[in-house]
Amino acid sequence: MVKYGLCCISNVLTEQRKLKFSIMRYNQYCKLGHDAALPIIAERTENNLLVTEQIIKLCASKGWTYRVSSCLFPLLTYKHAKFEYHDMPNWVKLDEIFLRIANFVCDNNVRISCHPDQFNVLASNNPDVVDRTVIELEHHGWMMDKLGGDRSHNTPINIHPATSKGDPADISKRFYEAFQRCSPRVQSRLVVE
């Protein structure tokens, strides 16, 4: 049986309801300064969660799966931006939206997944890349928990091996060692494509 799904955005919702994701680039953040940028990031994050909620409802109405956008949280995992989820002034409201989405996902049996960006390489021979990848994967695991996804391959975090440097046995060893650094919320969901 073929199962349809939606990847990140819905052109229909964008056209009909003007619902679209909002981002902030690091250069904008720097121009504004941290104190001015943080409320804007918080507002855009709230918008992104509300758009996600509407897309998930659309997917549920059609029996589709949904691949969650990796851009819900502008700059949250970017090390130079230096802020945490709970630093956003509206984090309590964000938690309420997350809970609403999680309840909907569970009540309607909506299958969700995510696919962190291609720069995430667990088998890299560059320790900085592996460190950043683990941070990104942990963020995605946290996000999938908040969205109500179960900790299984039914709610996958999908990545590519994305390296060809070295002997296949060495690549496998590096991947396994980096995988061991990940928490259960990542390990239980990680799928390699």
Where do the language-model regions lie?
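Active-site acidic/histidine proton-transfer and metal-coordination neighborhood
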Residues: 90-193
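Alpha/beta catalytic barrel-like cores
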Residues: 1-111, 120-131, 146-149
